[in-house]
């Protein structure tokens, strides 16, 4: 009898608050004076809907005064009623960390979706998702290239190891495919650990990604965290932080180099805008939240290299209506070390990855970092492609015959370069029937230098379509000409 009474008293002490208002994903909770939970604390409330009990997690967003707090629900609030008892967990949302997360799928709250035995296991270490970025004296100042084996990236927009890379593009130009390819290449070539955060994207894509990674044998080195389109804005706003927290553990505790993939960072911004509106804040430009730059900075500043280890981040950035002046992609630009723009006009030519070499950038494409020869070849390639672009109006109006002999050669080389910048991907093998290819950086520089020098001017353009290195070009040439 005494034990039962003690349990009841303990439960009453823990259940300190009660729901006073529910408007969609916004839940106002009243707590006794002096017992208000801190901002970002996770609260729990039991909900019964159609005889099914579930626990809804609320995150504290505002202190309203008069012992009231405003929270954002991390699950649908169907069945939640006024007066429901609310428990303060006294800590923020936390996720499991360590090797146990590899090969599994989690939601933003750290619940494993494919193996429920991992849930509520006290032996598994958990970290809160709201963390401070590394201090200034912990940061790594060295700059190093991350070789991907993808020609167009390694030559013209080299990625920084421990940097932040943005994959920009509208709908359907190949952002997710390029991210899947990078996960595969990192697992195969570097045996590295990857964390994938699916932010507000299609549930079908998440399922396909999980099955494809399992099929290709790279799932055991990857942790996946999803907060998809059908989930409340609070989940979509926090899932990127959940994935980042898992990556930080591998970097800080296991001293690993980690790749963090975020698909799609625009949905993170979009979810923040929804939450801001729900909380009653005055919107800023184009309806986005006034705290857009701050929220982006909180996420991006934690993605960095510390001494001896790194988090390299690839972030897909959906560009609304292909408008790069939109505040969401424009705010993201400020944090990136390299930008890879995927262009619909290049995709329409059947060239994949559809990277626009003239608008994609990298801060390390300079002689002091990549070397004189790499830099010179990249500038020659860009120069030829730029000249070809300038000549397109003349060609469209007057035709190729009106060009000078020098310009005709430039256009011909540009067309070969455009096709050779395409490449067959490992993740696309089952669609194209062509095996994926990894081209070392030195081979890439050699190949494009020879194309710029005119060594392949007598080769037909078809010999350069979507191939790997020069060996593939030679084989295609022999097949086309019968020589």
From Swiss-Prot:
GO cellular component, one term: proton-transporting ATP synthase complex
This protein's encoding gene: atpD
Source species: Corynebacterium glutamicum (strain R)
Gene Ontology molecular-function annotations: ATP binding; ATP hydrolysis activity; proton-transporting ATP synthase activity, rotational mechanism
Protein name as annotated: ATP synthase subunit beta
Keyword list, A-Z: ATP synthesis, ATP-binding, Cell membrane, CF(1), Hydrogen ion transport, Ion transport, Membrane, Nucleotide-binding, Translocase, Transport
Domain of life of the source: Bacteria
Subcellular location: Cell membrane
Role according to the record: Produces ATP from ADP in the presence of a proton gradient across the membrane. The catalytic sites are hosted primarily by the beta subunits.
Taxonomic lineage from the root: Bacteria, Bacillati, Actinomycetota, Actinomycetes, Mycobacteriales
Reaction catalysis annotation: ATP + H2O + 4 H(+)(in) = ADP + phosphate + 5 H(+)(out)
